[in-house]
Curated annotation (Swiss-Prot):
Taxonomic source organism: Bacillus subtilis
Source organism superkingdom: Bacteria
Protein name per Swiss-Prot or TrEMBL: Glucuronoxylanase XynC
Residue positions of the active site: E172, E261
GO CC entries: extracellular region; membrane
Task of the protein: Catalyzes the depolymerization of methylglucuronoxylan (MeGAXn). It cleaves the beta-1,4-xylosidic bond penultimate to that linking carbon one of the xylose residue substituted with alpha-1,2-linked 4-O-methyl-D-glucuronate (MeGA).
Enzyme class, UniProt record, top EC level: hydrolase
Sections of the chain in a coiled coil: none
Family designation: Belongs to the glycosyl hydrolase 30 family.
Keyword terms of this UniProt record: Carbohydrate metabolism, Glycosidase, Hydrolase, Polysaccharide degradation, Secreted, Signal, Xylan degradation
Pathway: Glycan degradation; xylan degradation
Gene3D superfamilies xref list: Glycosidases, Golgi alpha-mannosidase II
Length: 423
């Protein structure tokens, strides 16, 4: 659910991002990059779980059968999403609404996780939250019952053919004007005393803005940390400088790190095809992978006028930007080191899996860039590529040959290119 405050946060953030595009101005038609983009095939970083989005039939209606194929299939004119997020309704009579799309995602090899907005009504009480006397929180004597409620959802989905990969304890506990608030200490108590009884991987705490004061207490408490499997967060208005999380690197060994909800750069009506604004989506994913070390990137509504799939079921420009990652960087692939910024406004990330190297290169400049890619600690022979620009959507380019472990490629102005290198 969107609010004007959250939308304002995102608009302010994107103003800074888009200024770089606006200020580049006209110039020569192409340049050669100042530096090589070096890809070190043996320098492993994080394992990638996947890319995807949210289905919320209770609020905006279910995906149709055809839209499920577009979302989770990986053929032509399909997004290749490998992660689905679903809603844990406070009313169990509505749980059936989540089944069909989740089963379709599973059939296509995607993983499914679930997030609750509210506990059942009989577990909730109102309190005064900064003057709001109708604010909601989980009653302190209902923590165990709430854990069982989450278990019941896990079991319901399993009995209907969906084995959840994970379940969250709460969506945005720190931005709960329209759902249930949790303080950091309340989250800590639940994670320490109750989360261990949940029969699925547990995601916490899903802060709306990656506010570390929400998750630090979990990382600093051995029992709570033991009960958390995935640290999940949202990135609404989060500056890239806040993407790294040193405490997680220090104490989160064996845990996963997911970005579980965002829309970017805004949620304006009918904005999904704006160009070059949509190029910001691939840049945002790049920073999430490279600066944030996230293992999953999950959009808000899959089908929306500002989302990866428009209301008519067609893939949007924003969706094609996501597809440059989701279709090629498959679950279990590993991000590897690459020169992340070989030229101003050029961003490069690289991944390996299935005996391939996948390189995603984003050129935000108003001019084309000729970029040299150097493959280190591995051999390759041929490169396929796909390009999205103002005039193309995942358009296949001519294959390139690798000579002495490097290849040159033209990155069109304001474009994203995915290279698949055969090893």
């Amino acid at each position: 659910m969107m609010s004007s405050v959250k939308k304002t946060i995102c608009v302010l953030l994107v103003c800074f991002t888009m200024m770089s595009v606006m200020l580049l101005g006209p110039g020569v038609t192409e340049v050669s990059a100042a530096s090589d983009a070096k890809v070190n095939i043996s320098a492993d970083r994080q394992v990638i779980r996947g890319f995807g989005g949210m289905n919320h039939p209770a609020w905006i209606g279910d995906l149709t059968a055809a839209q499920r194929e577009t979302a989770f299939g990986n053929g032509q004119n399909q997004l290749g999403f490998s992660v689905l997020r679903i809603h844990v309704d406070e009313n169990r009579n509505n749980w059936y609404k989540e089944v069909e799309t989740a089963k379709s995602a599973i059939k296509h090899g995607a993983i499914v996780f679930a997030s609750p907005w509210n506990p059942p009504n009989d577990m909730v009480e109102t309190f005064n939250h900064n003057g709001d006397t109708s604010a909601k929180r989980l009653r302190y004597d209902k923590y165990a019952a709430y854990a069982q409620h989450l278990n019941d959802f896990v079991n319901f989905m399993k009995s209907n053919g969906v084995n959840l990969y994970a379940i969250s304890m709460q969506n945005e506990p720190d931005y709960a004007h329209e759902w249930t608030w949790w303080t950091p200490q309340e989250i800590l108590r639940f994670m320490r005393e109750n989360a261990g009884s949940i029969n699925a991987r547990v995601i916490a705490p899903e802060s709306f803005q990656y506010l570390k004061n929400i998750s630090d207490p979990i990382l600093n408490d051995p029992q709570a940390l033991r009960n958390m499997d995935i640290l999940g967060t949202h990135l609404y208005g989060t500056q890239v400088s806040q993407f790294p999380y040193p405490l997680f690197k220090q104490k989160g060994g064996g845990k996963e790190l997911w970005m579980t909800e965002v829309y970017y750069p805004n949620s304006d009506n009918n904005s999904a095809d704006r160009w070059p604004e949509a190029l910001g989506v691939s840049e945002h994913i790049h920073h999430s992978m490279v600066e944030g070390d996230f293992q999953a990137y999950v959009w808000w509504y899959i089908r929306r006028s500002y989302g990866p799939m428009k209301e008519d079921g067609m893939i949007s420009k924003r969706g094609y930007n996501m597809a440059h990652f989701s279709k090629f960087v498959r679950p279990g692939y590993v991000r590897i080191d690459a020169t992340k910024n070989p030229e101003p406004n050029v961003y490069v990330s690289a991944y390996k899996g299935d005996n391939k190297v996948v390189i995603v290169a984003i050129n935000k400049n108003n001019t084309g860039v000729n970029q040299n890619f150097v493959l280190q600690n591995g051999t390759a022979s041929q490169v396929s590529r796909w390009i999205t620009s103002s005039s193309s959507n995942l358009q296949p380019g001519t294959d390139l040959k690798v000579t002495d472990n490097h290849f040159w490629a033209h990155l069109p102005a304001q474009s994203v290119t995915t290279f698949v290198v055969k090893r």
